[in-house]
UniProtKB/Swiss-Prot annotation:
Record site: Transition state stabilizer: D484
Any one GO molecular-function label of the UniProt entry: cation binding
Species of the source: Eremothecium gossypii (strain ATCC 10895 / CBS 109.51 / FGSC 9923 / NRRL Y-1056) (Yeast)
Protein location: Cytoplasm
Listed Pfam families: Alpha-amylase (PF00128), Alpha-amylase_C (PF02806), CBM_48 (PF02922)
Highest rank taxon of the organism: Eukaryota
Phylogenetic lineage: Eukaryota, Fungi, Dikarya, Ascomycota, Saccharomycotina
Gene Ontology cellular-component terms listed: cytoplasm
Similarity comment: Belongs to the glycosyl hydrolase 13 family. GlgB subfamily.
Record-given protein name: 1,4-alpha-glucan-branching enzyme
Length: 703
């Protein structure tokens, strides 16, 4: 460890190959530590914590009502403006009557407005507001307050007169929702996350936008029944364009009004907590919508207030048609860190899945030739790696904040395809602080196999290598498919395997066809081996647990604004005559087995067998034996499987059970597999099992 800076010795001890890059790692950590020091000492003559900094920001910026005095304070940062005025329904949209009188040296305007003539708040609850800025040349621009907590689509009449831009509303309910349940306390040393990825708007079988209340009533019970202990909510931050899937955020502190009110979202999260389910927010800090009239773009009349300037070449994403934040700006740090604290405190979110981390980490955004990462450390840690040091420092601060606010159970997940080293190691040892990264190579592997290879040509070694290929001590969220694979232009695993047969042959009243038989069998095997071998956490996109047919396509001009494919057909599971119920039952059994035997939050599995001819894979993890026969036709009698611990083993999960859509080829009752004291495949003992084609077994040793 000679020559390695003290502040990154921890990560180098975990990965000695990082030693030559110690100085670079140290400098990157130093920038984040310096920013934190500057933030905590920004108050003259005093000190405040990072948490206090973030909380003070969301509690002071924007519109805030004082219940005792009935006054409203409005604070906004707009350094390019010379004057600022609050307008809205409350003053007949008079652009001169309510000026924010004070502008400080940093460009922050503040106005305090007393009660109205009736003694109540000057601005009625849920009424429309805007801010008007006067610029140096005397021109005026109209904007939605940057910290607004509710924004809604205009009525048809308003849209005809003023355009389709969203409208800001002053949210100040007389009886705000009161949380009833504490956050679930999942011991991270024991429990692992089984995440159900969901989008409230599509969570209805009907071709329309679903609501928070419907999700609470109809979907949460399904998630609990399946055995997932966390939900990842997508498209919550307000976005004017529904078809953006929530990734073109316009109003960062407003939750999507399409689904209902802020209080109804609070009830959803509180209800989930009462079920013992954590709730994660899919947070979008990687970019922002280009919208001007209802977004952050050109907010104070400049293109460089929250974002890098267009002229710098860093202000726009090359593919996403969106604006890119200037993470080196103190005020941008305030805005984004406060955004995280706001969702933790006000809505009781338990953590975040950070969207677009690869785009944030590199000046090239993972696009083009430089986005084809080979794993060479020079791609990440050389002077020419293209890493955006300011974005990396912001992500470190964000992780500091979240884990300071939620020290026991806060969860952070990075959507990173690049494999950046130390991303998911603790800040205390020199890492970036994320708890998990998404294992984004796994769904790509499964789709590629299904598209390009015959079943008999699948390489067991390639499957295993891809599933276990992750950085030491850096945890990943494994998944076979997510929302990305469901989007139009791609297909879900079930649709790749069964295609048109899902429309005609899923009824139990018809004889099982070879296409559906294969699809159901492989769907179970793919998901179980991904779950058990691919990571330390698991994610499923809603509907995929039962093999949801078709693709996901939001209403847009190309499909005639249709909602036909922007929904989840949960009714298919409830129909006892359809085979979707079998896949649902298997997914439930898989989650229950993990919940009881807890293989996810344990060291990586020991893989003892990858047989290319037999198409059999076997491994042990946390005392369990997992056996997969991917062969399309060949079943094996008395197949030898190496196990380390001697004893008697029993089946705890069998994909061939009838209730899972299998053929019941294994007699489970009173089945016990006794070990033979002879070495096999590098293990001290072996058992012999009957292994039908396209079947998976999980065995546990009897106590």
């Amino acid at each position: 460890m000679a020559g390695v800076p003290d502040n990154v010795k921890g990560v180098v001890e975990l990965d000695p190959w990082l030693a030559p890059y110690g100085d670079i790692l140290s400098a990157r950590r130093f920038l984040a530590d310096k920013w934190r020091h500057d933030i905590e000492h920004a108050v003259p003559g005093g000190r405040r914590s990072l948490v206090e900094f973030a909380r003070d920001a969301y509690k002071s910026y924007g519109l805030h009502a004082d219940a005792q005095s009935k006054s409203i304070t409005y604070r906004e940062w707009a350094p390019n403006a010379t004057r600022a005025f609050l307008v809205g329904d409350f003053n007949g949209w008079d652009e001169t009557s309510h000026e924010l009188q004070n502008k400080d040296e940093f460009g922050v305007f503040t106005g305090v407005f007393g009660p109205g003539a009736d003694g109540d708040f000057m601005i009625p609850h849920d009424s429309r507001v805007k801010v008007v800025f006067e610029l140096a040349d005397g021109s005026r621009i109209h904007r939605l307050p940057a910290w607004i907590k509710r924004a809604t689509q205009p009525s048809k009449e308003t849209a005809k007169e003023w355009g389709p831009s969203y409208e800001a509303r002053f949210w100040n309910p007389a009886s705000p929702y009161k949380f009833k349940h504490e956050r679930p306390r999942l011991d991270p040393n024991v429990e692992s996350l089984r995440i159900y990825e969901a989008h409230v708007g599509i969570s209805t079988p009907e071709p329309r936008v679903g609501s928070y209340s419907e999700f609470t009533k109809d979907v949460l019970p399904r998630i609990r029944d399946l055995g997932y202990n966390a939900i990842q909510l997508m498209a919550i931050m307000e976005h004017a364009y529904y078809a953006s899937f929530g990734y073109q955020v316009t109003n960062f502190f407003a939750v999507s009004s399409r689904y209902g009110t802020p209080e109804e979202l609070k009830e959803l999260i509180d209800t989930a907590h009462g079920m013992g389910i954590q709730v994660l927010l899919d947070v979008v800090h990687s970019h922002a919508s280009k919208n001007v009239s209802d977004g952050l773009n050109m907010f104070d009349g400049t293109d460089y207030q929250y974002f890098h300037s267009i002229s710098s070449g860093r202000g726009e994403h090359p593919l996403w048609d969106s604006r890119l934040f200037n993470y080196g700006s103190f005020e941008v740090q305030r805005f984004l860190l406060a955004n995280l604290a706001f969702y933790i405190d006000v809505y009781q979110f338990d953590g975040f899945r950070f969207d677009g981390v690869t785009s944030m980490l590199y000046h090239h955004h993972g696009v083009g030739e430089r986005g084809a990462f080979s794993g060479d450390y020079n791609e990440y840690l050389s002077d020419h790696s293209g890493v955006d040091h300011e974005a990396l420092a912001y992500l470190m601060l964000a992780n500091d904040l979240i884990h300071d606010m939620l020290p026991a159970n806060g969860v952070t997940v990075a959507e990173d395809v690049s494999g950046y080293p130390t991303l998911c190691l603790p800040r205390s040892v020199g890492g970036c602080g994320f708890d998990y990264r998404l294992a984004m190579a796994l769904p790509d592997m499964w789709i590629k196999l299904l598209k390009e290879s015959k079943d008999e040509d699948w390489s067991m070694g390639h499957i295993v290598y891809t599933l276990v290929n992750r950085r030491y001590k850096e945890k990943v969220v494994a998944y076979a498919e997510s929302h990305d694979q469901a989007l139009v232009g791609d297909k879900t695993l079930a649709f790749w395997m069964m295609d048109a047969a899902m429309y005609t042959d899923m009824t139990v009243l018809k004889e099982l066809t070879p296409v559906v038989d294969r699809g159901i069998a492989l769907h179970k095997l793919i998901r179980l081996i991904t779950h058990s071998l691919g990571g330390e956490s698991y994610l499923n996109f809603e509907g995929n647990e039962f093999g949801h047919p078709e693709w996901l396509d939001f209403p847009n001009a190309n499909n005639g604004d249709s909602y036909q494919y922007a929904r989840r057909q949960f009714n298919l599971v409830d129909d006892g005559l359809l085979r979707y119920k079998h896949l649902y039952a298997f997914d439930k059994a898989m989650q229950e087995a993990e919940g009881k035997h807890k293989w996810l939050n344990t060291p990586q599995a020991y893989v003892s067998l990858k047989h290319e001819t037999d198409k059999v894979i076997s491994f042990e993890r946390n005392g369990l034996v997992f056996i997969f026969n991917f062969h399309p036709t060949q079943s094996f009698t008395d197949y030898r499987i190496g196990v380390d611990e001697a004893g008697a083993y029993r089946i705890i999960l069998n994909s061939d059970r009838e209730e899972f859509g299998g053929h019941r080829r294994i007699e489970e009752e009173n089945s016990v597999f006794h070990t033979t004291d002879l070495e096999w495949n590098g293990r001290r003992n072996f058992i012999q099992v009957y292994l039908p084609s396209r079947t998976a077994l999980v065995l546990a040793r009897n106590p």
